[in-house]
Amino acid sequence: MKIAIVNDMPMAIEALRRALAFEPAHQIIWVASNGADAVQRCVEQTPDLILMDLIMPVMDGVEATRRIMAETPCAIVIVTVDREQNMRRVFEAMGHGALDVVDTPAIGGPNPKEAAAPLLRKILNIDWLIGQRVGREHVVAAPRSEPARRDRLVAIGSSAGGPAALEILLKGLPVSFPAAIVLVQHVDQVFAAGMAEWLSSASGLPVRLAKEGETPQPGVVLLAGTNHHIRLLKDGTLAYTAEPVNEVYRPSINVFFESVTRYWSGEAVGVLLTGMGRDGAQGLKAMRERGFLTIAQDQASSAVYGMPKAAAAIDAAVEIRPLPAIAPRLVEVFTQ
């Protein structure tokens, strides 16, 4: 994989160089010391992946991510030394299309390979994600029965560009929204709690991490909060599981959507938002085949038109809508 480093700190650059050296297939093609330089270098030589710092002179990592994704899009991972202090910037960058975030590898420790492992694992996942194919497996659903009570659920999946998209969508919903909402966003568990807090503050809706064994409740937004997959169980509660191990992104949108297909007996809507790759497309297809309404974000409003495009390609979406139109549609569906 051809990789670029954007960072103004020599020690951080050296730490990234040493980490990448453990995988000979990775080639560093250029290094930029600020965002403006990175934007220009991408025009001249677009890498497969950029390891992007956040705080830099001239142009910071958030604006550089926005410019690069608009002009010469490629995979971007945010690398930061202080995730707590930079949490808001992390989500802003992800809103512009950054795929993930990882701590800067430690340098000079007793086990440098172990220190490099989280970064190398992220890169491996992204390499796989870029090259994956849409499966055609059919999900066998339990027969849909008339529910004893009108349970309502909105299942939402998002990846690159997701935080900003989720903020816009949730802002469009009233506090009295009558359906439960479960979000599956591709984000590392160390950032999940911060993301829930940020979304809650930005949207005005109660957003918190989903807990093992709890039941989705109307008007409450639950965010998958670990690096395991989240599933709906037969009794209507939520559970985290390491299986299936072959799903690279954790939590997997497909896994959750398919569990909704199997076990949700009330009304449901599946929504697939911006993101790179194809996670969620097959799960959305399963929800449609079950008879649920399915919505995919359109190309014009997507920061990264990967997952919604994959869904459209296999006819998984009943409706394809611009992001600002999705919340009003959900209100319409559940207030008829």
Curated annotation (Swiss-Prot):
- Indicate the residues that form the catalytic site: 159, 186, 279
Q: Where would you say this protein principally sits, based on its record?
A: cytoplasm
Q: What biological process terms from GO does the record include?
A: chemotaxis
Q: Does the keyword Zinc apply?
A: no
User: Record's PROSITE patterns?
Assistant: CHEB, RESPONSE_REGULATORY
Matching entries from InterPro entries are given as: CheB-like (IPR008248), CheB_C (IPR035909), CheY-like_superfamily (IPR011006), Sig_transdc_resp-reg_Me-estase (IPR000673), Sig_transdc_resp-reg_receiver (IPR001789)
Q: Known SUPFAM superfamilies for this protein? A: CheY-like, Methylesterase CheB, C-terminal domain
Pfam families in the cross-refs: CheB_methylest, Response_reg
Q: Name one GO cellular component term.
A: cytoplasm
Compartment(s) of residence: Cytoplasm
Q: Tell me the CDD domains matching this sequence.
A: CheB_Rec, REC_CheB-like
**Domain Response regulatory: where?**
2-119
Cite the entry's keywords alphabetically.
Answer: Chemotaxis, Cytoplasm, Hydrolase, Phosphoprotein
Q: Quote the PTM field.
A: Phosphorylated by CheA. Phosphorylation of the N-terminal regulatory domain activates the methylesterase activity.
Give residue numbers for the modification (4-aspartylphosphate): 53
Give the EC number(s) under which this enzyme is classified. Answer: 3.1.1.61, 3.5.1.44
Annotated ranges, domain CheB-type methylesterase: 147-336
Q: Which GO terms describe its molecular function?
A: phosphorelay response regulator activity; protein-glutamate methylesterase activity; protein-glutamine glutaminase activity
- Report the catalytic activity: [protein]-L-glutamate 5-O-methyl ester + H2O = L-glutamyl-[protein] + methanol + H(+); L-glutaminyl-[protein] + H2O = L-glutamyl-[protein] + NH4(+)
User: What role does it play?
Assistant: Involved in chemotaxis. Part of a chemotaxis signal transduction system that modulates chemotaxis in response to various stimuli. Catalyzes the demethylation of specific methylglutamate residues introduced into the chemoreceptors (methyl-accepting chemotaxis proteins or MCP) by CheR. Also mediates the irreversible deamidation of specific glutamine residues to glutamic acid.
Question: Could you give the domain comment from the record?
Answer: Contains a C-terminal catalytic domain, and an N-terminal region which modulates catalytic activity.
Show the HAMAP family listed in the entry.
CheB_chemtxs
Q: Which family does it belong to?
A: Belongs to the CheB family.
Protein's UniProt name: Protein-glutamate methylesterase/protein-glutamine glutaminase 3
* Organism listed in the record: Pseudomonas savastanoi pv. phaseolicola (strain 1448A / Race 6)
Q: What is the lineage of its organism?
A: Bacteria, Pseudomonadati, Pseudomonadota, Gammaproteobacteria, Pseudomonadales
